[in-house]
Every structure is written in C-alpha cells, then in structure tokens.
Amino acid sequence: MGVQGQPSVAPALREVPAGFETAHANGAKYLEMYRESLENPDAFWGREGKRLDWITPYTKVKNTDFTFGKVSIKWFEDGVLNASVNCIDRHLRDRALQTAIIFEPDDPKEPARHITYKELSEKVNRMANVLLSQGIMRGDRVVIYLPMIPEAAYAMLACARIGAIHSIVFAGFSPDALANRINDCGAKLVITADTAPRGGRRTPLKANTDAALLHCSDKVRCLVVKHTGDQISWVHGRDVDLLYLMEHVSPECPPRPMNAEDPLFILYTSGSTGKPKGVVHTTGGYLVYAAMTHQYTFDYKDGDVFWCTADVGWVTGHSYIIYGPLANGATTLMFEGVPTFPDAGRFWAVCEKHKVNQFYTAPTAIRALMGQGPEWVEKYDLSSLRVLGSVGEPINPEAWVWYDKYVGKGKCPIVDTFWQTETGGHMITPLPGATPTKPGSATNPFFGVKPVVLDPQTAVRIGEVECEGVLCISDSWPGQMRTVWGDHDRFQETYFGQYRGYYFTGDGCRRDKDGYYWITGRVDDVINVSGHRMGTAEVESALVAHPQVAEAAVVGYPHDIKGQGIYAYVTLMNGIEPSEDLRKDLVKWVRTEIGPIASPDLIQWAPGLPKTRSGKIMRRILRKIAENDYGALGDISTLADPGVVQELIDNRMNRA
C-alpha cells in the first residue's frame, strides 16, 4: 500500500526557518514533552488540563480502555466546567475590547465585521436565552444549518452555555441529509438562515429546511436568521425570527456547570453510507485538546490573527475556527466565501487586509490556486504570515513546494496536519520551531499520540522504523471521540473491531528511516495491481508533479488481467489543451516517477472533480464512474458543483 518510488519534488529535509527560536517548542523540548506524555500521561495531561478554567477542578485525569467489548474513554471525569466560559467569559477582564471574530463576507464589496469579546459575550448570552425561551434544556440536541456567519459561532457557544448539544449540518447538504441528521440525534430545534451566499451564488437554506422538516417530528421548532433578506416561506407556530427574539431577551445568561464527560457536540461524518454516523465529543477533554493543538501546532502567540478557511460544518471549523482559538483568547477569522471568487486572489487579499499570521487551508484549495498561476499570490503583501497549515487530505509534494515558495516565501513553516473528525484535533503534525519538514509528510505525532503501523494482513505490529502498513493508535488522547450517538456497538466495531486493542484510523501510512509518517490515503483508496498494493495518493502526487497538471484523482477499476487497473482523472493547468500525446506523456511520467506498476491504464480529462463544499474529492463517485456503474451514485446534492458528475459520466473511458 504505498510508495513504489518518490516523486522528484519530495527530497530533502527542510530545516526550521529562522525566527522560530521563541516558538512554544523546539526540538529538544518536543522530545522531552512527548516522552513524558507517553510515559506519564496523568502528570502531563493533569498539567495541560489547567489551561482551562474549571468550576470544580478534576482529581482524575485518564481513565480509558481500548479492549474490544469494553471500550471506554474518560478524561478529567470528575471535573466541572463550561465551554462558553472558557471561550468568552474568562477573557473579558483583560481583552473585552479585543476582536474575537473577524467576519469576512462572501462579497468583497461588503465591509468586514470585527466582533469583540464583549460583543461576543452579549450575543451568545442573548442567543442562549432565546434557546431557553424555546424550551431547550440541558442535554437537548440543536441542529445548526447556517452559512459561515457569526450567528453560527453564537449558536454553538449558546448551546454550550446552557448544556444543549449542538450538531452542525454543513450548509451545502441536501434536505434528505439534513432530515436524517435531525432524526438521528432527536433534535428539538433547527437554527437556519434564509439563504447562504457562497461564491456569488445563494443556497436556499430555509427552503431546504422546510423540505427536511416534512420528514421530521412536527414538534421540531425552527429559528431563522434573516441574513440576506431573500424572500422565504414561513410556517406560523413553527418558525421564529431569531434576530428579533435576540433583541428582546436579557444580555445575561448564567452558564450551566457541565461535567467534563457531558457531550459538547455531535458531528456526523460526511460521505458515510447507510445511516449517518454521529461522532460524539465531550466537553473537557475535547476543549483541552483543541486549545493545546491550536497553540502548539500553529505556534499561536497572543495578538495573532488566525485564519482557518474551513467551514464550521466540518470538524476543522469546530476545532480551529471556534473552540481552539477562542479558548486561547485569539482573534479568529470567519470567511463566508470561496478561494476563487471574485477572482483567484481572494485568499491573499483577505490575508493582506487582515494581516493574517497563521493560515490553514486544504490541499485542494492550494492545487486550484496553483492552477491559476503564482501571479495571483504575488499581487498581495503576505509579509504578516508566520505559519502555513494544510488539512483534510495528504498534501502532494508539488503543492507543498508551491505553497512554501509563493505563499510562505520560504520563511513560513508548513504544518501538514493529519487528524480526523473522530480525533478532535491534530494527531500527526510538525511543530514550528521543533520539526524539520519534508514535503508531503505529516512528520511526527502530537503529544500523547502513540501511532503504530500494523501489517494489514496479519494485524501484527511492525517493529522496524522504516515500514508500511495501516495506521493505528495504541492509546487514548483527550480529544478522542467517545462514542457514536446512540450506537456504542457501532463505535466499537468501526474503530476497534478490525485491529483489537488499537484505534484504527482507516488510513494507510509509510514510516521512513527518520521515523517520519507519510499518510498514503484511506485503506479503501488502495489499488491492488497484479498483487502490488499501492496508495492512490502517491500516483496522484506523481501526476500533479507534472508541470501541465493542476489536479488529479486516482481510483481502481476492474481489470481482466491485473485484477485492478489504475484510472486517473486529470485536470490540466489553465491554457493547456488535452491531447493524446499529453496522455502518453503522463503515463511515461508516472512510470518514471514511481515505476511501471503505477502506470495509469486510463486517463480521463476532467475540467472539474466532484468535491464537497469542504474541498474533499468524492472518490466514491469517481470509482463508480470508473467501474462504468454510475446508475446509483446516491445523493450528489452535497457537492460544490453537482454538474461535473454528468460531464465525467459522458466522457468516461471505461465503457462497457
């Protein structure tokens, strides 16, 4: 499962750039802290837990068991706290007038809004009182289906304030997906908006909510944010104007003391088949881990402006737009738009405008902007940037090098972060000031994380440093999910059933001679060609390393002789025309980069790839098309541009 050879752009170790002598951790400190976090987790996390304010301090730290049939995860279990107090109230004495949230609207002509910690406190308290007025109590579930607007942050923190459990459904999801999630968690209330602007278009959130609620209990109430002023239908007795109510309630709402193990939120994993899988994160451990990873991974310092470009509908937005930054008293940026609207300079214009210090985005965005050319980056002053981050999928070395050269100017460490919805925060990542990097490698584990590489056939732990296999984690960390909502058996079976005694990430990895980890993609994104196992990420990296390729996605398809063949979807750089000669050149290129075994059997030119709004490529759809089995693609309304699917079907290479 993995690399048969290294792409030409993934060479050398990159030493820590100058200027990071005062980072939170240098190499020696990282090793010392990491060793303690494994050898004495109670002492290590007992100390780190004190970064939060506790109503009742904990006396117990770690109480976890990975034994199949008895899986139980508890951290700080006798402590009592409130997440909203840690994200707001405790900052009011010293930073009431500091900006907590910068809101950058979709339309660049609209002014940005700066929301201070004082204003955030008032808005969250008012929204909490609105929730109480609607009969929401501790433990009740509230579904949030909102655009990337400040009200989404207010809603999350208002739920946390009164002990309600929020479940955000990404604003690009269909009415069916929304209804499934409302029903699965038994939500009493949905918070939505009239419409959601994004890239100059509008998504009809209220209409989608109306359609979803036809399939839910008639007792579910609906709070509506009138965001754009677009005309919407109104169901009297069910729908309530949220902003109007907020003006007519008290700006003070006492926080509800919560046990550390009380659920904070449920987040449904996207793209799962069958019944949605509600990942449960609890209050104490999750918040400690989100705050600590935000501080160390990005070398966050007081006064920094932090921008994570994700949507709050994904875990990245939960941990690194809201909970991590606000627990640390940071200024966090919420961006309603997309990287290419109104043009390919939008990200960089926002960085310049708000003097962003840490910038955290997805490889798919970097590759899309690569394809537009570096001139869009060079138009803007990015001298404020200190740390660059990558999240969501393995970053191919070509994109890493471009990001480093044009965005970071060779001066910003790149933190390529491996983690998951289920992990709550970073698992394997470089730390600025501590970790020399390699383009395409997630490098070293975060504090408290014990990765192991197992043989996928025998499930035996591989002892050699240099090896390849499936990535598992051998012990718990505070940010770990606790269960699947309403289905603990499914939780145990999914994550602890296949490799007993370990948490199974579902990803393959390679560990190199320096002990660095390279994520090779989901184990179900592994192609077995003539008995050779190969991670799709490596073939994609080789293709994207070609100077005329902007993006590539690789899947397997049934092959009469090899068992599986390699099917590549390739998006070319702007201005490059597809041709048979170029197709042959790409096959030759991959043979040179990786080896003959990795040669693509079929290459389809793809002006666009099917992606979720968070930028993840939906390889499930690509596999179906490659297999010439596109009759049951399922719900594609969650894609950023569903239209690309028909184009891919029409131009498929593997016709029966």
Curated annotation (Swiss-Prot):
Positions of post-translational N6-acetyllysine modification: K616
Sequence positions that bind ATP: G392, E393, P394, D416, T417, F418, W419, Q420, T421, D507, R522, R533
Keyword Glycoprotein: no
EC number, as in UniProt: 6.2.1.1
Post-translational modification: Acetylated. Deacetylation by the SIR2-homolog deacetylase activates the enzyme.
Residues annotated to bind CoA: R198, G199, G200, R201, T316, S530, R591
GO molecular function: acetate-CoA ligase activity; AMP binding; ATP binding; metal ion binding
InterPro entries named in the record: Ac_CoA_lig, ACAS_N, AMP-bd_C, AMP-bd_C_sf, AMP-binding_CS, AMP-dep_synth/lig_dom, ANL_N_sf
Catalytic reaction(s) noted: acetate + ATP + CoA = acetyl-CoA + AMP + diphosphate
Entry cofactors: Mg(2+)
Source organism, top-level taxon: Bacteria
Gene3D superfamilies: 3.30.300.30, N-terminal domain of ligase-like (3.40.50.12780)
GO biological process, one term: acetyl-CoA biosynthetic process from acetate
Residues annotated for Mg(2+) binding in this entry: V544, H546, V549
Keyword Acetylation annotated: yes
Keywords: Acetylation, ATP-binding, Ligase, Magnesium, Metal-binding, Nucleotide-binding
One CC-aspect GO term: cytosol
UniProt family annotation: Belongs to the ATP-dependent AMP-binding enzyme family.
Cited function: Catalyzes the conversion of acetate into acetyl-CoA (AcCoA), an essential intermediate at the junction of anabolic and catabolic pathways. AcsA undergoes a two-step reaction. In the first half reaction, AcsA combines acetate with ATP to form acetyl-adenylate (AcAMP) intermediate. In the second half reaction, it can then transfer the acetyl group from AcAMP to the sulfhydryl group of CoA, forming the product AcCoA.
Name used for this protein in its record: Acetyl-coenzyme A synthetase
Phylogenetic classification of the source organism: Bacteria, Pseudomonadati, Pseudomonadota, Alphaproteobacteria, Rhodobacterales
